[in-house]
Amino acid sequence: MDALRRHSLLIILFGSLVVTLAMGLRHGFGLFLEPISSELGWGRGVFAFALAIQNLLWGLAQPFAGALADRFGAARVVVVGGALYTLGLLCMGLSDSALGMTLSAGVLIGLGLSGTTFSVVLGAVGRAVAPEKRSMAMGIVSAAGSFGQFAMLPGTLGLLEWLGWSAALLALGAI
């Protein structure tokens, strides 16, 4: 296997892993709605507002994350996005106020998602793979996001039932 092909396969593999984790964790947040709202005595609106902010920032920040990836490299943007995502999960697990939940689940994770999901990762894959293999490579990485939902939800639910919502979020942040 030549070096270029090995490099392309590594980008596809690591890109798929990043998207699997990012999307798998993100789509598990609904499992936390009831336990967080019940334990902290909030209405569901606090958690829903935090996730609405997350979606808004995720969408708004993607063009900027893409521009940063073009300028500084996708790997750096993915690392920073992953760090923001991790920090958001850890802060979310320690949050006991509406503001804390909005800043962690909303702002930090929303910005983290912009650096760890499709816009940055697919851009890197598109640059690394030969044109005749590009569609297949992008399809594999995109499918990894769906696989993440399938694979991560049972584990997230298991952690939630075993550890409770706060410790489960801390454990997911450690991943």
For the regions a protein language model found, what residue spans apply to each?
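Extracytoplasmic
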Residues: L10-R44, Q62-A65, L153
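Residue-level signature of mid-helix packing/kink "hotspots" within the transmembrane helices
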Residues: H27, N55-P63, T116, Q149-F150
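Helix-to-loop junctions at the C-terminal end of transmembrane segments
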Residues: A61-G73
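C-terminal ends and interior cores of transmembrane alpha-helices
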Residues: A83-D96
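Helix-loop junctions at membrane interfaces in 12-TM secondary transporters
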Residues: L94-S104
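Cytoplasmic helix-loop-helix junction between adjacent transmembrane helices
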Residues: A105-A143
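Helix-loop-helix hairpin linking two adjacent transmembrane segments in secondary transporters
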Residues: V141-I175
